[in-house]
Structure formats: structure tokens, C-alpha cells
Amino acid sequence: MKGRSPLRVAWALLLTFGLLAWNTFPAASDATKTTTGTASGENWEISGDLTEACTCAVPCTCNFGSGPSPRHYCYALFSLDIQKGHYGKAKLNGLRLAGTHGKKADVWYIDERASPEQASALKAIAGRLLKEPKVKVYVETARITQEVGEKGNRLEVGEWGGFEAEYIMGLDKKTPVVVENNTSWNIPRSIKGKTKRLHYKDRHGNKFDLKETNSNQGKFDWNDQTPVYF
């Protein structure tokens, strides 16, 4: 250090330490990439028709921010007819994803027509839709029949159950009653219907069989950034 001022020596030491630190610790942006990136899974989007019925009377008071009625529970059976959709590069157009919420379990049904890649994609999406299940969750495969008409809807999920409903017509007796922005399902407009019969029974202990219960029919458009689905 002979011939150098104390100030120049201090700056040299500081610069040396700074270079060592730069090469030793990763940049903040790199650390961010490590913790985010694709950790949340593939990007996805699905849109189409939602067909649903539950054990509540018409109208289901859950759709208006209240508890179930006239019983203390609300068990539901529904299906998503995916008219356009993808999970990453996997196309999901024309497939269906059905589900039920019961006393003993929640069960997802993958369309039996799905390829192995599509089935994995639908299972992954199902996991995103149901974020905080309160009961056990199962995933199975089934033939799903979903029909949407001008005066009613119909759903059959394999041998497990289904329903048929007629839309509730308004005062003009021509157009159905519609509820906008309901509190249960993320669909802009929900056509209200009444089931002729809603029945379901599975191997997990869920069972219900009722008549004249609530039904909803509407369009959905969900993706991996949608804040809430139902």
C-alpha cells in the first residue's frame, strides 16, 4: 500500500468487495423468475354453456347471497359444455366437464371422449375451479349428455344421475326469467328453471332425489386469471 492514500485504498477495497458480491448473489429479477414462471401451471381458458340444478327450491336463495332453502343444505349437479377452450397447447373444444357437490364428497367427471392429454388438462382445470373443498374430492370418467334448448335444459352424467328442467317463463309467457350477476355462479346472465326431477347417487355416499328444484342455465367464460368461478 506504499505510496497510496488511505482514501484510495478504501475505495479499492470497496470496489473489490462489490464485484465479489455481484458474482456471488443472484440478481433480484432472476430470483423472481425462479419463484414465479410456470409455477402456477399452464395458462388456460374455457367458455360455453353451464347447466346446473340443485336441491334448493326455486329460486335458490344461495344465488342471492343467503343460505339454502327450504332445507339446510344445497347439493348441486352441473356440467360445463366447453365450446371453445384450451389448457396450454391442449385443445378442449367440444368436451364437457361435470361435477357434483354432495354431503359426503365433491366429484368431478371427465368427458369419456377426452384423450389422455385432454383428460389431464380437464383434471388440472377442475383443481383450479375448486380451490378450497370442504369435503373429499374425487375425479372419475363418465359419458356426459348436456342439452340446452329454448324452453329447458337436460343433463345426464353416466349412471350416476341427472335432471331435466323447464325454464320459468316471465309475464309475457314467451321469454324466461333471467337473473344477472348472481352470487353463486360466475355467469353474467342466469336463466331460471324448475326441475322435473333431480337425482344423483354415487359410490362415495352422496344421494339425493327431488322434484321441482332450482335450475340455472347460462354462458361462462373462465380462465386462469378469473378471480372466482363459483
Predicted regions, residues:
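Bacterial N-terminal signal peptides
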Residues: 11-21
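N-terminal low-complexity, Pro/Thr/Ser-rich intrinsically disordered segments
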Residues: 32-46
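Beta-strand-enriched cores of mature, soluble protein domains
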Residues: 42-230
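N-terminal secretory signal peptides that target proteins for export/translocation
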Residues: 1-6
